[in-house]
Amino acid sequence: MSKELKLFRNFGIMAHIDAGKTTTSERILYHTGKNHKIGETHDGAATMDWMAQEKERGITITSAATYAKWKGHSLNLIDTPGHVDFTVEVERSLRVLDGAVAVLDGQNGVEPQTETVWRQATKYNVPRIVFVNKMDKTGADFYYSIETMKNRLGVKATAIQIPIGAEADFVGSIDLIEMKAYIYDGKADEEYKIEDIPADYLTKAQVMRSQMIDDVAVFDDEVMEKYLSGEELSHEDIKKCIRKGVISTELYPVLCGTAFKNKGVKKLLDAVVDFLPSPIDVPPIKGVDDHGNPIEYHNDPNEPFAALAFKVATDPFVGRLTYIRVYSGKLDKGTYIYNATKDKKERISRLVKMHSNNRDEIDSISAGDICAVIGLKDTTTGDTICDEKKPVILEQMVFAEPVISLSVEPKTKADQEKMSLALSKLAEEDPTFRTYTNEETGQTIIAGMGELHLDVLVDRMRREFNVQVNVGAPQVSYRETFTEVADAEGKYIKQSGGRGQYGHVWIKFEPNHDKGFEFVDNIVGGKVPKEYIKEVENGLIEALTSGPIAGYQTIDVKATIFDGSYHDVDSSGMAYKIAASLAFKEAAKVCKPVLLEPIMSVDVTTPDDYFGTVMGDISKRRGVIEGQEQRGNAQAIKAKVPLSEMFGYATDLRSNTQGRGQYIMQFSHYAQAPKSVTEEVMVARAKK
């Protein structure tokens, strides 16, 4: 089986928006024989962009999985979104993949979202190769793209191909391993001629090959010895070194082409097979057993079954689909599994391999593979499913909290019931989507990562669930926190005939910067019985959902229960829960709570002519400029700007740059809001 696993490649395609990820994926499907016709993103016909919203907008919204064969290897491919609002799709895909292809726009090189997805891949130690796409584009520069990798990503980027021609004259590439020229005919089948290197490229190719060998030889001692002794390295020597460097995540080989014009994708597929790891090349997955002890699982079908659920989707024909990556053991359809995260047993009805939104039934799946499961009702993203006799919880995923919200109101009574179902289904699918009811107004609030994110979700409610809703204006999701330390008492006593209620606590509250809510039990001598401590914590968690300033969630607070008392008859869990919330309210009077506003990382690209206007506009929005650099005939500006100041920015940027400016925005952190903003928020809240 290890021999078979060696032939697996689980990889994703990741990039900045519009770099050509999906077009590259479509060419891969065509060349591997998975598709018999090429689907184009701009025609709304891409296989991997199957959602109606994706076809209309020409962007990828949800990660799409497929599988194919190439030169005797089994490929599991996931095409991920490039827009920051859907970064959760990239995060959960990279968590379960063994490798990735980073696609760069040949004109722009590393762009802001490239940096984001690169960081995500680094977080999960995902080996990568790089495809510089759109080499036929005006202004395309392969060597500039490599420099941006070195300067902006700080990585060892090594060309293993160089282009022949550029822009409209791009005709092929030189393979620096083989020292041969590949000249493409540009037709769908991507036929090419292998020729000697043109004379006017020979010197450049020799210099670049020498640089490549310098970069890669260090990854194998035997090869390094041959190289230093002046021996000629074989093609296999070089490939072995590149593979080792890639798997160590210390080397990033760079290829070039233009997927849309059918140049370079077959060589990219060769590189996926040659250089990206198989499941047995990556480190074992870590987790904890049912006693909390660390445990490792290897990609071995003979070990106990363990898999991670990384995505949940709703299929109109089969219902709930749960995507899993199997790390060890084997799973058969019709069997029972144990959800160690939820402590529940569930039955696997069917197993399917996904091709975008199409399903191919399979009977079983083994370690190292990816599939979707039908029949799991309680398993959600990040859950571990395993053998009940050998329980394990694998390393879990952590997702960003929503920063923007809006109200949704059903248009009719019939829509009310359908809306509740739609929201619960969408929340199951998307860990960065939240829905709740505003207790003061009774409104249903939905929260997400950005305006586009919420716009797509509302559109899905209307189309997929036939729910008609009125939508409110986007609102900022503020937070609150404490800035000083205080001890607070919470005492709840109620006597109304029969058994009373008694709960009494003393809790120390203190700021807990960037560490979330932390609860500490410092009770000694049984002053508060152990069985009520959890209820104290639960009472605080509930109280934190509505802060003292404007009713926003209170975050980054440490609460230590250190004293209290109890009554033999009247004490109850509910009484201590209420006492804890009373202590929180008392603390809020003296801990000097402040309002926190979300601060966004904003990357703006503008032509030189409009640079001053754009900079001035950012400053007006309370933005802090962090850096700028020249990119061709444009300026790239990095800034931190409060989210509340960014509504309507797309329209203003278009106006200020004659439609030529672009920007990308993502959440950075929460920071204390100025007094004027706090007062505005309090006034607005009071009017509701």
From Swiss-Prot:
Record's keyword annotation contains Chloroplast: no
Keywords: Cytoplasm, Elongation factor, GTP-binding, Nucleotide-binding, Protein biosynthesis
Compartments reported by the entry: Cytoplasm
Main location, first listed in the record: cytoplasm
Residue span, tr-type G domain: 6-280
Residues reported in the UniProt entry to bind GTP: 15-22, 79-83, 133-136
Cellular component annotations (GO), alphabetically ordered: cytoplasm
PANTHER family per the UniProt record, alphabetical: RIBOSOME-RELEASING FACTOR 2, MITOCHONDRIAL (PTHR43261:SF1), TRANSLATION ELONGATION FACTOR G-RELATED (PTHR43261)
General function of this protein: Catalyzes the GTP-dependent ribosomal translocation step during translation elongation. During this step, the ribosome changes from the pre-translocational (PRE) to the post-translocational (POST) state as the newly formed A-site-bound peptidyl-tRNA and P-site-bound deacylated tRNA move to the P and E sites, respectively. Catalyzes the coordinated movement of the two tRNA molecules, the mRNA and conformational changes in the ribosome.
Protein name: Elongation factor G
Origin species: Ureaplasma parvum serovar 3 (strain ATCC 700970)
